[in-house]
Amino acid sequence: MTHTRTAIDTIRGYYYQFDLYALQILESKGENITLEGIEDVDVNSATETTAIQCKYYEGTTYNHSVIAEPIRWMLKHFKTHKTDTFKYKLYGFYKDGQDKLMLPLTVEFVKDKFLTFKEKGTKHKLYSELELSDADISLFVSRLEVDINAMSFVKQNELLLKMIRQYWNCSQIEAENFYYPLILKLVREIATDKIEENRTIDKDTFIAKIIAHKNPLVDIWFAKKCASNEYCKSMHKMYFSNRINMNPYERFFGSGAEVRG
């Protein structure tokens, strides 16, 4: 049971990240979005870049140690880009314990809770090892946003589906069973491209890719997300109900494959 729950949590974590990718792209207003860049998502405007790391720990109580490592990584990036216009954001969902984090962050709190740690029995003070002054840490903190009250898996997914319905003026069934699987497929393809330039996209290009895809899509990941009987019922209602005389070729469904005649 524990193994199964862990596997489910892992899958939900991936979906949570994919949904965040899609939301960042669809909510963007002229920015370029890079997936798996400096962080999970980089939002690049004409004047600055915000590097966002996403953490989804549905079964984990928040502790400072849970976010300390990604913050240390951000500090290392900051060390070599102090004069650049980078901002950093840690966006996370946790079961409980959020009241342990006092905001706004202070230099001493960040140094003590996030940048001081033990590794293999040795105590480290990362700010000292990186030769960063309190003024440097203060600048870093001013560029750092920590949000550990992120939306739940369900709420974020509902927001994405709502945005899909509004943007394409479609039904809930169409949003869930056509647009959402297609968006997942496109996001995954972008995020896993080995060339960083290809992992950068703007909203207009992303929308054009969706519009260009005319055929219904059965996404393997999406099929795993819901029970197969529920999925089949939705697809039948969407494409087959009240369409008794449908051309048999229109009934073909494949994993992103086109029907060629």
Please give the residue ranges for each predicted region.
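Acidic metal-coordinating catalytic centers involved in nucleic-acid phosphodiester chemistry
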Residues: M1-I8, Y57-G261
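Catalytic centers of nucleases
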Residues: H3, T10-W73
